Swiss-Prot record:
It catalyses: Preferential cleavage: Tyr-|-Xaa, Trp-|-Xaa, Phe-|-Xaa, Leu-|-Xaa. Keywords: Collagen degradation, Disulfide bond, Hydrolase, Protease, Secreted, Serine protease, Signal, Zymogen. Residues 1-15 form the signal peptide. GO terms for molecular function: serine-type endopeptidase activity. It comes from the Eukaryota. Serine protease with chymotryptic and collagenolytic activities. It is found in: Secreted, Extracellular space. One of its GO terms (cellular component) is extracellular region. The keyword Secreted applies. Disulfide bonds join C71-C87, C196-C209, C219-C245. This is Chymotrypsin BI.
């Protein structure tokens, strides 16, 4: 049986000045958190990673949803952004910021675009967290440059044990009061779905998990962002443990390879 699911909404007060907002933001992370069924021993430490080199992940999008929620996303064409269904479920509008590194600054590289044209997967299940995938259509194609680029979809699946790199502006530690100013990244290995399912009990074929041993993982605010490898996005940040981001539990991502047909049907984008 699955563990009890709790939805953590972390409210973060943020200074104004970002081109996506003309007023102070109160950002919340809608990342679903699942109670693990087993205990993992881990020494709590910073949730991983380092500040990314500015604009080294030029497909990374920052999503400001309904003036309330913050998520990440991936630019997969000049018109389409890939993100998580739990980010867009019930949303009215989204402000997509591309070309950003420090989301609390007015960087010359940033482009802000508002969209009301988006949809979640038809079979998205917010209780079981299945089909946690969504697409945002930009009202007009964005101009690509060295700071704003598209990311490729994978033509093959990612193997267990492969080191992958999730990126995002999520909380850098469980004790952090808010999300990160700057884009961060962490290198982590892919684990088996069987081992991940033994922890959460809701891990199906459409999910890929990373091993959070040592406290390296995604956290609140990273939702919808990419799982990167060799210029491709293999996953969409989906859910983690309600015990905390630093505790050594796996983090789960929507497996992009599993949804290639769905993405192509909706957008025409192929690997």
């Amino acid at each position: 049986m699955i563990g009890k699911l709790s939805l953590l909404l972390v409210c973060v007060a943020v200074a104004s000045g970002n081109p996506a907002a003309g007023k102070p933001w109160h950002w919340k992370s809608p990342k679903p958190l699942v109670d693990p069924r087993i205990h993992v021993n881990a020494t709590p430490r910073i949730v991983g990673g380092v500040e990314a080199t500015p604009h080294s992940w030029p497909h990374q999008a920052a999503l400001f949803i309904d003036d309330m929620y913050f998520c990440g996303g991936s630019l997969i064409s000049s018109e389409w952004v890939l993100t998580a269904a739990h980010c867009m479920d019930g949303a009215g509008f989204v402000e997509v910021v591309l070309g950003a590194h420090n989301i609390r600054q007015n960087e010359a590289s940033q482009v802000s675009i508002t969209s009301t044209d988006f949809f979640t997967h038809e079979n998205w299940n917010s209780w079981l967290l299945t089909n946690d995938i969504a697409l945002i259509r930009l009202p007009s194609p964005v101009s690509l440059n060295s700071n704003i680029k598209t990311v490729k979809l994978p033509s093959s699946d990612v193997s267990v044990g492969t080191t992958v790199t999730p990126t995002g502006w999520g909380r850098p530690s469980d004790s952090a009061s808010g999300i990160s100013d700057v884009l961060r990244q962490v290198n982590v290995p892919v684990m088996t779905n069987a081992d991940c399912d033994s922890v959460y009990g809701i891990v199906g074929d459409g999910v890929v998990c990373i091993d959070g041993t040592g406290g390296k993982s995604t956290c609140n605010g990273d939702s919808g962002g990419p799982l990167n490898l060799n210029g491709m996005t293999y996953g969409i940040t989906s859910f983690g443990s309600s015990a905390g981001c630093e505790k050594g539990y796996p983090a789960a991502f929507t497996r992009v390879y599993y949804y290639l047909d769905w993405i192509q049907q909706k957008t025409g984008v192929t690997p």
